[in-house]
Curated annotation (Swiss-Prot):
The lineage of its organism: Bacteria, Bacillati, Cyanobacteriota, Cyanophyceae, Nostocales. Rod linker protein, associated with phycocyanin. Linker polypeptides determine the state of aggregation and the location of the disk-shaped phycobiliprotein units within the phycobilisome and modulate their spectroscopic properties in order to mediate a directed and optimal energy transfer. The keyword Thylakoid applies. GO terms for cellular component: phycobilisome; plasma membrane-derived thylakoid membrane. The keyword Membrane applies. This is Phycobilisome 9.7 kDa linker polypeptide, phycocyanin-associated, rod. Keywords: Antenna complex, Membrane, Photosynthesis, Phycobilisome, Thylakoid. One of its GO terms (biological process) is photosynthesis. Disulfide bonds: none annotated. It is a peripheral membrane protein. Belongs to the phycobilisome linker protein family. It is found in: Cellular thylakoid membrane. InterPro entries: CpcD-like_dom (IPR008213).
Length: 85
């Protein structure tokens, strides 16, 4: 019984959270050709990432030569951050 409690996935709010990664420096190559979006070397792109996949996505972006410049919750307006500074 204790084992089943320990292996059961948590149904906390973190399972439903989504974040937006702002990424720069990704290069278009054979691996990125499989993405649903085009990569432009001169600009940043935004990628929606579920909380449960953040670590994997961080590694993938680094492996592809990108750099994460900002992470924010998906529902947050990006202009709100700029007005606070």
């Amino acid at each position: 019984m204790l084992g089943s409690v320990l292996t059961r996935r948590s149904s906390s709010g973190s399972d439903n959270r989504v974040f937006v990664y702002e990424v720069e420096g990704l290069r278009q190559n054979e691996q990125t050709d499989n993405n649903r979006y085009q990569i432009r070397n001169s600009s940043t792109i935004e990628i929606q990432v579920p909380y449960s996949r953040m670590n994997e996505e961080d590694r993938r972006i680094t492996r592809l030569g990108g750099r994460i410049v900002n992470i924010r919750p998906a529902g947050e307006n990006p202009t709100e951050d700029a007005s606070e500074n």
